[in-house]
């Protein structure tokens, strides 16, 4: 069996009432870009800084459990979760397998160059951000591509050609940067979702790559 640990990046108690959760969520996702633009002017104050650091703390917790086999730490996610899976694999050498679906936060600053499409969260909707050099520097600093360079473990990446949330060009930016053992599953018809078959194949892949 597996130990499964699913994270919620905002530190919210999953037991709070749905109405309260929805109210807080609206606050995190306001009309000015929401939490993904919070602190973007300063890379040391950017909201996602504590999220990225939290990935390492999650692995600290998992590897402290007596049920852990002492060998394997697989990270998996889609969209923002796909981004965090790659980031975790790049930050922490305890990670042994990485699976990511259509990772967000990839090639974010591409919109600043004429004719290029950037990744989610699509800061092109907030033109002032793209005019701010400090914001662009922070985007580049936290971009998934930077962490993909540091990944050394087997990685399984999937994306679809009809995805307009995380465009396929941004997944290719990640794929082309990965220098580790890697495998891709391209699903041309897919938008921003995965099929049950894809999810199953990912679990098979993880099982095949477990350290015995």
Language-model region placement:
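Hydrolase active-site cap/lid region
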Residues: 82, 86-131, 186, 194-197
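Active-site nucleophile elbow and catalytic-triad environment of alpha/beta-hydrolase enzymes
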Residues: 131-147
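Gly/Ser-rich "nucleophile elbow"/oxyanion-hole loop immediately N-terminal to the catalytic nucleophile
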Residues: 34-79
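Short alpha-helix in the alpha/beta-hydrolase fold that links the catalytic acid
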Residues: 153, 167-176
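C-terminal catalytic histidine-bearing segment of alpha/beta-hydrolase fold enzymes
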Residues: 172-212
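Cap/lid segment of the alpha/beta-hydrolase catalytic domain
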Residues: 3-53, 110, 116-117
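Acidic catalytic loop of the alpha/beta-hydrolase fold
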Residues: 161-166, 192-193
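Short beta-strand/loop motif that positions the catalytic acidic residue
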Residues: 150-151, 157-159
